Amino acid sequence: MQRIKDIKPKELVAGVTGYYAHGDKHTLGLVELKAGSIVPEHHHVHEQITYLLEGQLDMTIGRESYSLTPGMFHVIPSNTPHSAIAIKDCKAIDTFSPARDDYKSSDAAVGWKLEAQ
């Protein structure tokens, strides 16, 4: 048993920090985004579900734009380009399947940046 905040944090981009737990087949993350931070457009083979706990997060998924508020979630299919802007300070839960092996390394951003559009 472990607390998510006891996991070593990974800065994905400026203002975006994640705490990731890994199973054999999926990854769970608590992501904190500072207001104004931008997750640039990228894609990955993993299916992703983002559930917003706090704040307001504007996302573009494929060609559609969405504004997530607390309690809302979105499923991002495999290999679908997506990006986000934190309108307010945010806390979100992200899940990925299959597991994000690239997030298990000490530099999570390396694998992610390689897949950026």
What is each of the regions a protein language model found here?
Residues 53-54, 69-70, 88:
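A cytosolic small-molecule/anion-sensing beta-strand core signal
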Residues 28-29, 38-39, 55-60, 74:
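Short beta-strand segments in beta-sandwich/barrel cores
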Residues 32-34, 44-59:
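Short, conserved beta-strand element in jelly-roll/cupin
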